[in-house]
Curated annotation (Swiss-Prot):
Main location: cytoplasm
Name of the protein: Probable protein BRICK1-B
Gene Ontology annotations for the cellular component aspect, listed alphabetically: cytoskeleton; SCAR complex
Family (UniProt): Belongs to the BRK1 family.
Stretches assigned to coiled coil: 41-72
Biological function: Involved in regulation of actin and microtubule organization. Part of a WAVE complex that activates the Arp2/3 complex.
Single biological process term from Gene Ontology: actin filament organization
Cellular location(s): Cytoplasm, Cytoskeleton
Gene giving rise to this polypeptide: brk1-b
Amino acid sequence: MASQEDPVQREIHQDWANREYIEVITSSIKKIADFLNSFDMSCRSRLATLNEKLTTLERRIEYIEARVTKGETLT
């Protein structure tokens, strides 16, 4: 009877080891996904800020070009 329990016990231990391994992998994947989502939000925010600054600069350039074209002084 003991010889029959040994393989069963080994299978149970192996099953638990596999489950723990799967849990570690799953947890790591979740952490990576959380990081990537956070990184995405951060990049989008920074790009939006940069876009606003570029738009402001483009408007200033257009204004200055218009004044130069009309021959006005910039002061």
